[in-house]
Every structure is written in C-alpha cells, then in structure tokens.
C-alpha cells in the first residue's frame, strides 16, 4: 500500500500518519530524514546531497527522486510506504511518475485556513518535556503552566500567526495544485483519490481512513 498525504500544515496529517503506519505496518518516508541518512551513510547520492547543501543550495528534484527510489527498495517498504511532504509540486509528481514510482492512494486532508491558524497559534509547549497543550482544545490545568512541573509554557516560533499564514500561502501556491493533478490521475485509473474532512474529531477521521484503505 503506497500512500501520499496531502494537506496544509496543521491539517492533522501527522496524527493520522502515525495511525496508518501502526495499523498497516508501513513506514513513513520523510525526505528530510532520507537526506540526513544518505549524507551520514556517505553513499554516492549522499555525497552529492552534501555538496549541494554545503553550498547552501536546495537539493534538486532529481536527487530527491533518486533517494526515494533507493529508499523504497528497502525491506521495511515491502508492504508499501507513506509519503508526507513529498511531492510538493507538480514537476516533482511528474518526476515520480516518470521514475515508475506508483501510488495506490492519495489522501487529501481538507481543513479551512482559519481553523488551521486557530489550531496552530493556540499551541503551547513545555520545552523541557515536549508536552504540547492547546489553549482551546487541550488547555493546561493552570493557564500558561505545565500540568506536571508547573513551569512556564511557551509558543514555538513556527506556531506564531505570521509564520503560519506564510506557510499557508506557500502551500496554496505550490502544493494545492497537486489536488487537481492527482484527481485527474484517479480519473485515469492510475491511483485512488479520497478527500477527508480534517475538521472532524481524530477518531472519526481515523474511522473514515479505515473505510477508505480497508
């Protein structure tokens, strides 16, 4: 089972990715993790990636596709894999197709922008333990304090409104066109496309995914 997750940052993909991995026994493939592993291993692709990153440049689509191809031949991908955060653009999706990387399901998590902003800017973190709260959906017992230690909670830089809105603009410009791309692919019988209502409670979204994936 080869799955791509689409959706804006904060649409709840991470939570459901965890569930899919455990339920179906497939690994999540993160391009960031792959790049770091390739550089560490000193493989030919890793050396190329290191040179590009050391020069402060962005790694090319060709190189990322080559890494994905190499990664999915590994034993843990025998039953499939889950891609989140890749492809980000139509040229990347085309390159994947040309490289013969077929996908069984494309799952789109649909959540309105304002709700995403609400979800993210309400997050509060206890830095030392990694505990995450939400002022509206999962508040601490005492406002602004960690339940366990009573220490101050903070807001991550990534969770500030300006940053969140910037990331949403980027998503709509670059990644949202993939929704149309994969809808067409599904009509052509090359994959199955499903839109999931990410505004529903986690358990309901999970049940919907089980229905889709079987």
Swiss-Prot record:
The keyword Kinase applies. Residues 122-159 are annotated as: LID. Its EC number is 2.7.4.3. InterPro entries: Adenyl_kin_sub, Adenylat/UMP-CMP_kin, Adenylat_kinase_CS, Adenylate_kinase_lid-dom, P-loop_NTPase. Keywords: ATP-binding, Cytoplasm, Kinase, Nucleotide biosynthesis, Nucleotide-binding, Transferase. Pathway: Purine metabolism; AMP biosynthesis via salvage pathway; AMP from ADP: step 1/1. It is found in: Cytoplasm. GO terms for molecular function: adenylate kinase activity; ATP binding. Belongs to the adenylate kinase family. This is Adenylate kinase.
């Amino acid at each position: 089972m080869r799955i791509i997750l689409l959706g804006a940052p904060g649409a709840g993909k991470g939570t459901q990715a965890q569930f899919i991995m455990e339920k179906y026994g497939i690994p999540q493939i993160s391009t960031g993790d792959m790049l770091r592993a390739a550089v560490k291993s000193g493989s030919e692709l890793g050396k190329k990636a290191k040179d590009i990153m050391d020069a402060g440049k962005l790694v090319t689509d060709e190189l990322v596709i080559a890494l994905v191809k190499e990664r999915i031949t590994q034993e843990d991908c025998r039953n499939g894999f889950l891609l989140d955060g890749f492809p980000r653009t139509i040229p990347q999706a085309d390159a994947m197709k040309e490289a013969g990387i077929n996908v069984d399901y494309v799952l789109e998590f649909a959540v309105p922008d304002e709700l995403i902003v609400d979800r993210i800017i309400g997050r509060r973190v206890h830095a030392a333990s990694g505990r995450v709260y939400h002022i509206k959906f999962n508040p601490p017992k005492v406002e602004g304090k960690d339940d366990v230690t009573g220490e101050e909670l903070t807001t991550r830089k990534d969770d500030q409104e300006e940053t969140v809105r910037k990331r949403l603009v980027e998503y709509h410009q670059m990644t949202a066109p993939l929704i149309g791309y994969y809808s067409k692919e599904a009509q052509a019988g090359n994959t199955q496309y499903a839109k999931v209502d990410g505004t529903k409670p986690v358990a309901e979204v999970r049940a919907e995914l089980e229905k889709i994936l079987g």
